[in-house]
Amino acid sequence: MSTETVKTPLASGRKAIFSPASSPVYAPGRRDFFKYRQLAASEGEMTAQVMTTNAGLTEPTGWHYHICESQFIYVLKGTLDLDLEDGSSVHMVAGDSLLLPGGMKHNETSTSTDFELLEVMLPKLEGTVPCDPPGSDQSK
């Protein structure tokens, strides 16, 4: 089988898209300490990727938000800690999931060394925007 994504036309004109795990496609990421493996579903309609880290998160990501309608995350392996705009903190383990509305500020603060996460954004991710922490006085 080819190492390229296989596209099969359907009667509707849409295509089934297959990306074999044996030939992963990695995209440049928003963070140097994460690896972003793009999944077939990323064909412009949504962003779907598996995020991993080689040594665990060594520093927080910093407060940011994503330009999308929804961000769904599902922890495949390891752990993830993050702070949310509403003041809550979440500790996630394998099997946990979280749905964030687009534009919600958050900050990943730590991961385990074996961290692996499925992330889906609808519609596709249009950008990541660094921002001040919630409640900070932006006039200073």
Where are the predicted features?
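Double-stranded beta-helix
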Residues: 2-19, 107-140
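A short glycine-rich, His/Asp/Glu-containing loop-to-beta-strand
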Residues: 25-63, 69
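Short histidine-centered beta-strand/loop micro-motifs
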Residues: 28, 60-67, 84, 90, ...
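Residue-level detector of conserved, well-ordered beta-strand and adjacent loop positions
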Residues: 40, 76, 93, 101, ...
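Short strand-connecting beta-turns/loops that link adjacent beta-strands
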Residues: 44-45, 87, 113
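Short, conserved beta-strand element in jelly-roll/cupin
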Residues: 51-54, 65-82, 120-123
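A generic structural motif
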Residues: 70, 77, 87, 103-105
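Short acidic-glycine-tyrosine-enriched beta hairpin
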Residues: 86-103
